[in-house]
Amino acid sequence: MLQKKKINYPLQQIARIKTGVYCNPSNTGNAWYLQAADLQADGCLSRGLKPTLHLEGKLQDRLLKKNDVLFMAKGVNNLALAYDPKTYGALIPSTAFLIISNSNTGVLPGYIAWYINQPPAQQYLKAQAKGSSPPSITVKTLGELEIYIPDIETQKTILKVHDLRTREKQLKSDIEHLKEKILNYQLSKAIRK
């Protein structure tokens, strides 16, 4: 029986990597200027982002596109997020981010983000980070990260299981929050008697 050989590819062979852009945000606009504080520790974008940029001229070219992956290049939380225009709307990332533009149909953007967020990839990136306050990951370093690419069905299965686990954790958190509210209500009621 032949065993499949496990092949890793440098990310730069799979996708194009570019930096975010520096802009002066305003109080109004028709696009969101994504800054470091907008990415939460769980890898999700903050809720309630407000449009702070007017899309004009060269800024149009900097809009995130479907299949792009956002990567937090500066700071200690070097997380990746697959961009979905239906969920997040028009976004232009700041220089705190690297953008992984994936045009390879054999690799799902969600899989790239999931792989980057796994402990072995995170350990590699942290070991290669430049500077100390805050540390940052360069385009070159991210491009050299080797990624194992299974078949598309395996990628879909991984993402489905990951999504289910994430949902399970959220439900457990919600249940704990509700239990806390019930207990506090009952204790407050007991002392009022």
List where the protein language model places each region.
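Non-catalytic DNA-recognition/assembly elements of restriction-modification systems
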Residues: 1-29, 149-193
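Sequence-specific dsDNA recognition surfaces
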Residues: 8-23, 39-66
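Basic, amphipathic alpha-helical recognition segments used for DNA target recognition
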Residues: 11, 98-148
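Short, surface-exposed loop/turn microsegments at beta-strand edges and helix-strand junctions
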Residues: 25-31, 62-64, 83-95
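Compositionally biased, charged N-terminal/linker segments
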Residues: 26-42
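A structural connector/turn signal
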Residues: 58-59, 87, 132
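Generic structural signal for buried aliphatic residues
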Residues: 68-71
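A short beta-sheet element
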Residues: 73-114
